[in-house]
Regions:
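A specific heptad-register position in long alpha-helical coiled-coils used by two-component signaling proteins
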Residues: 20, 24-27, 31, 126, ...
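Generic recognition of well-ordered alpha-helical segments
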Residues: 24, 28, 56, 123, ...
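PAS-family sensory domains
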Residues: 23-24, 28-29, 103-105, 222
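C-terminal catalytic subdomain
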Residues: 159, 212-221, 226-286
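A structural signal for long alpha-helical coiled-coils and helix-turn connectors
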Residues: 2-5, 30, 34-37, 41, ...
């Protein structure tokens, strides 16, 4: 019996001695173990199939094409730590005002429970887009809804922004995500918008930050799984390394910037197991 191989039978004689009874018992145990092993294999196969289906569904829920405007080019990428994850992003267009909006979010926990919470939150946001809320109003409304409807053991960090393509104005509210980065004229600065994670307190308040952008600016939103990725010595990637990616990416389009971020993160961890979902949005003002 090697590596869980129970597919054998012990030969039993026709005598009634104790040894033959023991061998009959061994055969019974082996047959039971064989059935149990096959049952476990079938269960594992069904779980893998369900996770693969959930992963395909989650991929379809993500925007297949990002909105394009005259002055803003956006790219995004999400890499879950497991088959499904709690990070997600989305983009919208406000029909009446003409503003663009978007979000990046990170649900506490990992795997299927986080993915279900993410799907709930994404659906709530989608149902409120027609109201054309500003970022502060969106976070306030979303927080109240999640506080009422979501499980107590989960919460979510999220940044929501609107983009005025005519006036090059970005407005952003942040509920617990790392501070977004702005590259401008050879320097990187943090956008100091703060707020508590969503779903923790019913009456949490959020602030909005308005940025007058300029052509040539690059904006970077990201979840903490990016900067908290560690190398073999347990040193995290960190915001400074992420800022250095932006500094070295001057002249590249948004899609290439996103790829550069993941390339540098992977170089840092040197193929160590990814323990958290990672999501990046890069936007270039043109």
């Amino acid at each position: 019996m090697v590596d869980g191989d129970f597919d054998f039978v012990v030969q039993v004689s026709n005598s009634d001695d104790d040894l033959d009874k023991l061998l009959l018992l061994v055969n019974f145990v082996m047959a039971t173990a064989r059935r149990s092993l096959n049952d476990l294999k079938n269960i594992h196969k069904r779980v893998e199939e369900d996770l693969a289906a959930a992963r395909r569904l989650q991929e379809k829920l993500s925007p297949q094409m990002l909105p394009t405007s005259r002055h803003l080019c956006a790219s995004a990428k999400c890499v879950p730590a497991r088959a499904v994850g709690g990070d997600f992003f989305d983009f919208f267009r406000y029909e009446r005002s003409g503003l663009y909006s978007g979000l990046i979010a990170d649900v506490s926990g990992k795997g299927a429970p986080a993915a279900l919470y993410a799907a709930l939150a994404s659906g709530i946001v989608g149902s409120m887009v027609d109201n054309e809320l500003n970022p502060q109003q969106m976070l306030t409304a979303l927080n109240r809804s999640l506080f009422r409807r979501a499980p107590d053991e989960h919460f979510m960090t999220l940044a929501y922004f609107t983009w005025d393509d005519e006036n090059l104005v970005l407005e952003v509210s942040n509920a617990g995500l790392p501070e977004p980065l702005l590259y401008r004229n050879g320097e990187v600065q943090r956008l100091r918008a703060h707020g508590v994670p969503l779903g923790l307190f019913a009456e949490a308040e959020y602030e909005s930050l308005r940025i007058q952008c300029e052509r040539g600016d690059t904006l970077l939103f990201y979840t903490d799984g990016v900067v908290e990725t560690v190398d073999a010595t347990d040193k995290d990637f960190g915001t400074q390394r992420l800022s250095n990616v932006l500094l070295s990416a001057n002249g590249y389009d948004s899609a290439r910037i996103v790829e550069m971020v993941f390339e540098r993160v992977n170089e840092h961890c040197q193929c160590a197991m990814n323990t958290d979902d990672q999501t990046v949005i890069a936007m270039k003002v043109v």
